[in-house]
């Protein structure tokens, strides 16, 4: 079974995107990372930084998660990210996404040993 850490990498990590600037980026990535398998995942964020830099966030600023848990961490610096958001015309199995690039601080939930990101909580 896929570990929570591996799932985070599959769903959220894209360190050196070949086509993040393309408006089609989300449509391609959401499909290739299996985020449209049994439904269209409505919202998803890809982080264009090294895995080491994202894992390091687990040792940065401790903040509360959206669900009230206390194991979330906010990155000290802004990171290159791409937000993918399902459009109104999207209907499974033809999932359609809007691609938005940004530079924001990320908030991730971490757990385990080694202590690594297992959930993408927000960007600010």
Curated annotation (Swiss-Prot):
Entry GO MF terms: lyase activity; nucleic acid binding; ribonuclease A activity
Binding site for substrate: 7, 10, 41-45, 66, 85
Cellular component, GO annotation: extracellular region
Top-rank EC class of the record's enzyme: lyase
GO process annotations (BP): defense response to Gram-positive bacterium
Similarity section: Belongs to the pancreatic ribonuclease family.
Protein name listed in UniProt: Ribonuclease pancreatic
Gene that encodes the chain: RNASE1
């Amino acid at each position: 079974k896929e570990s929570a850490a591996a799932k985070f990498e599959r769903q959220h990590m894209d360190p050196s995107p070949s086509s993040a600037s393309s408006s089609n980026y989300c449509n391609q990535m959401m499909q290739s990372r299996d985020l449209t398998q049994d439904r269209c995942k409505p919202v998803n964020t890809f982080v264009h930084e090294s895995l080491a830099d994202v894992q390091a966030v687990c040792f940065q600023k401790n903040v509360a998660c959206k669900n009230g848990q206390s194991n979330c961490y906010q990155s000290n610096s802004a990171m290159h990210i791409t937000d993918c958001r399902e459009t109104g015309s999207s209907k499974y199995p033809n999932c359609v996404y809007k691609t938005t690039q940004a530079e924001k601080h990320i908030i991730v939930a971490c757990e385990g040993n080694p202590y690594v990101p297992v959930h993408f909580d927000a960007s600010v």
